[in-house]
Swiss-Prot record:
Transit peptide, UniProt annotation: 1-21
Modified residues (Phosphothreonine): 523, 526
Cellular component GO terms held in the UniProt record: mitochondrial membrane; plasma membrane
Main location: mitochondrion
Side of membrane Mitochondrial intermembrane, spans: 22-86, 134-144, 201-304, 350-363, 426-432
Gene field: ght8
Protein name: Probable high-affinity hexose transporter ght8, mitochondrial
C-alpha cells in the first residue's frame, strides 16, 4: 500500500465522523416533521391542529445519544487494548448499524426511539475515540493535523447532507418523512465498514504488543520504502524505544492517568473537549429549527440548511489552518471571535427581535442569522477540528486509549447536558442564553493560552517530550524538539531525488548522532539518538510546571 493510498484510506476512517454528523444533523429536522410529532409528541393543540413536545421529552429524544456516547467512550478503551483499533472500529460500526435499525422500526413507542438513540450513541462515542486516535498514529507527522481534521470535516459533511435529506423528505407522506432520513444512515455505516476492512493496523499498536515484524511490513508499505531505508529504521527505533519505556510499568490502569507524568494532559484533554461543546455549536445544530422559528424565518428547514452549508464549507479551511498556523493561535482567536458573535447574537435577540406589539422584527432576525453564520465560520476552522487533533496527538501510547476516552467522555457529557437542558433554559431566559456561551468561549481562549502547547510538525514521541520538558506553553518550545521529524523529511526528499537508489548510497543526514541503521538486525531494540536524549535535569513532573 503506497502513501497516497494510505492517506485515502485514513480519510475513510473519518466516516465515523460522518455517522456522528448525520445523526446530529437529522434529529432536529425529524422532530419537527408532522408524522413524527403525531406519533411521538406528548402535546396536541386542537385549535391549531399542531403537536409539540414537553421540554423533558424533547431533551430526552434529542440528547440521549450523548448518554450512550459517554458509555461508548469508556467501553472503547479495554476493547481497543485487547483487539486493536482497526478491529474495534469494525465492531462498533456493526453496533451503529443495529442502532439505526432500531430507530427506523420504532413505531409507535417514543421509548424505543430513546433506547435506540442510546444504543447508536454507544457506537458514535466509541468511534469518536478510535477514529482520530487511529489517524494520529498512522498519519505522517507533517500531515497529521490535516488528516485528523478530516474527522471534523466528515462530521460537518454528515450534518449538511442530513439537512439536505430532511429538506427533501419533510413533505413526504406518513412515516416516509422521517424513516428515509433515519434509514439512509445505514449507508454511511456500510461504507465505513468496507473502508476500514482494507486498512492495516496501527504500527505503534503492533510494536506495543510485540508484533514488530508485522509493524515493519506496514511501515514499508505505507512509505513505499525497503526495510533498510533510513526513514523506516529511524521511525521504527524511535517508536520501539518509546514504547518500551512507556510500557515498562505494565499496562496503564485508570488510576495511572492521574500520575505525575500524565495528569496535566489528562485534564487538558478533558478541558479542551468539554470546552468544544461549551462553545455552543450544538445550540444551533440540535435546536436550529426552534432558533430560526424564533427569529421569524418562514422556512426553518432552509435556514438550517444554509447554516449547515456554511459549517461544511468552512471546515475545508480547517484542513489548512491547523497546518499553517498551528493549534494554539487558531483556538485562541477562534474563542475570542466566537465570544463576540454570540454576544451580538444574544443582544439582538434579547433587545430587538420582538417588537412591542409582539411581532418579530425580521431585520433583527436576519442579523442574528448572519452572526450565527459568523460563529460557524470560526468554529468550523478552529474549535471543531482542533479539539480532536489535540486529543489525538497529546498522549503517549501507554495512556492513549484511556486518556482519549476520558477526554471524549467529557465532550459527550456536556453535549448531553446542553441538549437536554437547552429547552428548559430557552423557555426561561430566551436569547439571553447566548451570553452564557459568549462567556464560555472567552474562557476557552484563555485556557488554551495558559495550558496548551503548540505541537505543529512534531512526532507523537516529540510531543510527549515537549509536555515533559517543563516549558511554558506561551514561550518558544525547546530547540532540540522536532529534529527527528526534520531529519526524516530531509531523508525523504533525498530519496525522491535519487529515484529509488539504494539507501546505502543516500547521503547520511544524521548529523545529530542518529544511530546507524545500515545493520540488518533491524528488529533489535536500540537507544534513541543523542538528539532525542532526555537529560533528567531538563524534565519535571507535570504538576510542578506552574509552581
Amino acid at each position: 500500500m503506497g502513501k497516497t493510498l494510505t492517506i485515502v484510506m485514513l480519510v475513510f476512517v473519518s466516516m465515523a465522523g460522518w455517522m456522528f454528523g448525520a445523526d446530529t444533523g437529522s434529529i432536529g429536522g425529524i422532530t419537527n416533521m408532522r408524522d413524527f410529532q403525531s406519533r411521538f409528541a406528548d402535546r396536541y393543540n386542537p385549535v391549531t391542529d399542531t403537536y409539540s413536545y414537553s421540554s423533558a421529552r424533547q431533551g430526552l429524544i434529542t440528547g440521549m445519544v450523548n448518554v450512550g456516547s459517554m458509555t461508548g467512550c469508556i467501553l472503547s478503551s479495554p476493547l481497543m487494548d485487547r483487539i486493536g483499533k482497526r478491529v474495534s472500529i469494525m465492531f462498533w460500526t456493526i453496533v451503529y448499524l443495529i442502532g439505526i435499525i432500531l430507530q427506523v422500526t420504532a413505531v409507535p413507542s417514543w421509548v424505543q426511539i430513546m433506547v435506540a438513540k442510546i444504543w447508536t450513541g454507544l457506537a458514535i462515542g466509541a468511534l469518536s475515540v478510535l477514529a482520530p486516535g487511529f489517524q494520529s498514529e498512522v498519519a505522517p507527522a507533517t500531515l497529521r493535523g490535516t488528516i485528523v481534521t478530516t474527522y471534523q470535516l466528515a462530521v460537518t459533511g454528515g450534518i449538511f447532507i442530513a439537512a439536505c435529506i430532511n429538506m427533501g423528505t419533510h413533505k413526504l407522506h406518513k412515516t416516509a418523512q422521517w424513516r428515509v432520513s433515519m434509514g439512509i444512515n445505514l449507508l454511511w455505516g456500510i461504507i465505513m465498514f468496507i473502508g476500514i476492512s482494507f486498512l492495516p493496523e496501527s504500527p505503534r499498536y503492533l510494536i506495543a504488543i510485540g508484533k514488530d515484524e508485522e509493524a515493519l511490513d506496514i511501515m514499508c508499505k505505507n512509505n513505499v520504502l525497503p526495510r533498510e531505508h533510513e526513514i523506516i529504521q529511524t521511525e521504527y527505533h524511535v517508536i520501539k524505544t518509546d514504547c518500551e519505556a512507556e510500557m515498562a510499568g505494565g499496562p496503564a490502569t485508570w488510576g495511572d492517568i492521574l500520575g505525575a507524568d500524565i495528569r496535566y494532559r489528562t485534564f487538558l484533554g478533558l478541558g479542551v473537549m468539554s470546552l468544544q461543546q461549551l462553545t455552543g455549536d450544538n445550540y444551533y445544530f440540535y435546536y436550529g429549527f426552534e432558533v430560526f422559528e424564533g427569529t421569524g424565518m418562514n422556512s426553518p428547514y432552509l435556514s438550517a440548511l444554509i447554516l449547515d452549508a456554511v459549517n461544511f464549507g468552512c471546515t475545508f479551511g480547517g484542513l489548512f489552518v491547523l497546518e499553517f498556523f498551528g493549534r494554539r493561535m487558531p483556538l485562541i482567536i477562534g474563542g475570542v471571535w466566537q465570544s463576540i458573535t454570540f454576544f451580538i447574537y444574544a443582544a439582538v435577540g434579547n433587545r430587538a427581535l420582538t417588537r412591542k406589539n409582539g411581532t418579530s422584527n425580521h431585520r433583527a432576525g436576519a442579523v442574528m442569522i448572519v452572526f450565527s453564520c459568523l460563529f460557524i465560520f470560526s468554529f468550523a476552522q478552529t474549535w471543531g477540528p482542533a479539539a480532536y487533533v489535540i486529543v489525538g496527538e497529546s498522549y503517549p501510547i501507554r495512556y492513549r486509549s484511556k486518556c482519549a476516552a476520558v477526554a471524549t467522555t467529557g465532550n459527550w457529557l456536556w453535549g448531553f447536558l446542553i441538549t437536554f437542558f437547552t429547552p428548559f433554559i430557552s423557555d426561561s431566559i430566551g436569547f439571553k442564553y447566548g451570553y452564557i456561551f459568549a462567556a464560555c468561549n472567552l474562557c476557552a481562549a484563555c485556557i488554551i493560552f495558559l495550558f496548551a502547547h503548540e505541537t505543529k510538525g512534531l512526532t507523537l514521541e516529540e510531543i510527549n517530550e515537549l509536555y515533559l520538558s517543563g516549558a511554558k506553553p506561551w514561550m518558544p518550545r525547546p530547540e532540540n524538539l522536532g529534529q527527528a521529524a526534520k531529519q526524516q523529511q530531509e531523508v525523504l526528499e533525498k530519496s525522491r531525488g535519487v529515484q529509488g537508489e539504494s539507501a546505502a548510497h543516500l547521503e547520511n543526514v544524521d548529523n545529530e548522532g542518529m544511530e546507524d541503521t545500515s545493520s540488518n538486525d533491524i528488529t533489535s531494540s536500540t537507544s534513541s539518538s543523542e538528539g532525542r536524549a532526555k537529560p533528567e535535569s531538563n524534565y519535571v513532573d507535570e504538576q510542578d510546571r506552574y509552581a
